[in-house]
Structure formats: structure tokens, C-alpha cells
Regions:
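Conserved nucleotide-sugar donor-binding catalytic segment
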Residues: 150-202
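A conserved acidic beta->alpha catalytic loop
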Residues: 45-54, 73
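Cell-envelope/extracellular polymer assembly enzymes that use nucleotide-activated donors
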Residues: 9-11, 40, 189
Length: 202
């Protein structure tokens, strides 16, 4: 990895639109991470109308939270990601958290960033558990995409519908490739693009 200077080692990126029921928990999960490095949380609020914007303003006292309302009105999830990644405060690693998700524990962000250095990769993909709103496990349970292998990951990726989560990216590479401005399959598309030239860590 190059020595490009970043103020923050990592940024948790949360695109959101109308998720008043879950956005507070998602942001709290991100802000509660315990790390050995500085990080922030960038929320791209895609013109919410259900109180999500006001809920995010409740975190205004925490300067680690950057709340962005894009000027554009035609952004999909991928477009929101591009806004966040190109923000001047985006960290060296851009780490996904969906607006209706939680990290497993307060050490998740540290584990993800450590993996970048251990495996010298451009993207890291983890494992997640499907639950209901009460955090009870629901089918299909754990999603780990074990069909991915170091030797044949890119080829296997063409045979599955998604690459897994949480996803994290080395920001300089992501800024060059960019997400497609869509709200379905944008993560799969960027993963396939990265896998053509770079290593994806698991």
C-alpha cells in the first residue's frame, strides 16, 4: 500500500434513505467501535423524509460523525457511496455498514483494517448473520460465502449472487474505480471490478 496521507485510518460509510427505525442503532454500532487508530463515520442521507435526517442530527455533538445530504437528487446507493468516498475526510479504508445493520461487536472495525495489512488486499469481505428486529436468527442464518477461495475467487464470484458483507475497500483504489450509480447490485459490480486486478481478503 502506498503512503498517501489520510487524516483517518478508516471511515464507516452508511448510505441511508428513510430508515428511521434502524438508523440510530446503525450509527451507534459504528461509533462504538474500539480501535487503535482514528476513524470517523460518514452518513450519506439521500433526502430522507421520514425523520431519519432529524435522528442523525441527534449525533451532532460527536465530531466523528459526518452527515452529508447530497446536492444531487438522482443518486442510488452506489452514487451515495461515491459521495462518501470522495469526501475530504474519508479515511484510508472505507468500510460498509448498511443503515439497517449492526456490527457484531466493538472490535469489528479493527479486525477489518488489520486484515488489509495482513493480506495486502484492496478489498475485504466478512461474514454476516440474518436476524429479525429482535436479533433472533432467521433463515438462512450465517452468510459466509465459503465458495470464495484465494486460488479461484474471481471465477467463483461469477457464479454467486453477491460477495458477502461487511465489505471494505482501500480508498485510493475505490476512488479510481467508483461504484455504478444504482441501488441494486452496486456492491457486486464493484467487487467484480476489483477482483480483476487486485486481491480480495476474507
Amino acid at each position: 500500500m502506498d503512503r498517501e496521507a489520510f487524516e483517518f485510518e478508516a471511515s464507516v460509510i452508511i448510505p441511508v434513505r428513510n430508515r428511521i427505525r434502524t438508523i440510530r442503532d446503525a450509527v451507534n454500532s459504528a461509533l462504538s467501535q474500539q480501535t487503535t487508530f482514528p476513524f470517523n463515520v460518514i452518513v450519506i442521507d439521500n433526502h430522507s423524509t421520514d425523520g431519519t435526517t432529524e435522528a442523525l442530527q441527534e449525533f451532532s455533538a460527536d465530531n466523528r460523525l459526518i452527515h452529508i445530504i447530497p446536492q444531487e437528487n438522482d443518486l442510488g446507493i452506489g452514487g451515495c457511496w461515491n459521495v462518501g468516498v470522495h469526501h475530504e475526510k474519508c479515511g484510508k479504508f472505507a468500510v460498509q455498514l448498511d443503515s439497517d445493520d449492526l456490527y457484531k461487536d466493538e472490535h469489528t472495525l479493527q479486525k477489518i483494517v488489520d486484515t488489509f495489512y495482513q493480506q495486502n488486499c484492496a478489498m475485504v469481505i466478512g461474514t454476516y448473520l440474518m436476524t429479525d428486529f429482535q436479533m433472533n436468527e432467521i433463515a438462512p442464518g450465517v452468510i459466509d460465502h465459503k465458495e470464495w477461495t484465494v486460488e479461484d475467487g474471481p471465477n467463483n464470484a461469477l457464479r454467486i449472487n453477491g460477495l458477502g458483507a461487511p465489505r471494505a475497500f482501500y480508498t485510493p483504489i475505490l476512488r479510481k474505480i467508483k461504484f455504478p450509480n444504482t441501488s441494486y447490485g452496486e456492491d457486486y459490480a464493484i467487487g467484480l471490478s476489483i477482483s480483476r486486478e487486485y486481491t480480495i481478503g476474507r
